[in-house]
Amino acid sequence: MDPRYWGSSFWIVIFIIITKFKHDIETCKRHLYNICKALPCAECKDHALQAIQKNNIMSSNDINYIYFFFISLYNNLVFNPERCIDIKKVKKLI
């Protein structure tokens, strides 16, 4: 399934979850992991889960580390470079 059709919706959900659960990090991580496991593209799912594991996201207790990890992941995968998030303009959540 082509992520150009559903990808932006998943990214919106990911960033909503991070901001909504910034004070409940365990719930946040659980939701993020489940979303990545449910990605309709097998390659995207594998890539996301490998990146989560490689960067120790599930063992992190720092919401900003998780937030900036997902921003970086998004920027590395975005189809249109104009849609990249300028990391210099992003403020920490807490």
Curated annotation (Swiss-Prot):
SUPFAM superfamilies: FAD-dependent thiol oxidase. The keyword Oxidoreductase applies. Its cofactor is FAD. InterPro entries: ERV/ALR_sulphydryl_oxid_sf, ERV/ALR_sulphydryl_oxidase, Sulphydryl_Oase_FAD-link_ERV1. It is an enzyme of class 1 (oxidoreductase). Residues 1-94 form the ERV/ALR sulfhydryl oxidase domain. It catalyses: 2 R'C(R)SH + O2 = R'C(R)S-S(R)CR' + H2O2. Keywords: Disulfide bond, FAD, Flavoprotein, Oxidoreductase. Disulfide bonds join 41-44. One of its GO terms (molecular function) is thiol oxidase activity. Its EC number is 1.8.3.2. FAD-dependent sulfhydryl oxidase that catalyzes disulfide bond formation. Belongs to the poxviruses E10 family. This is Probable FAD-linked sulfhydryl oxidase FPV093. It comes from Fowlpox virus (strain NVSL).
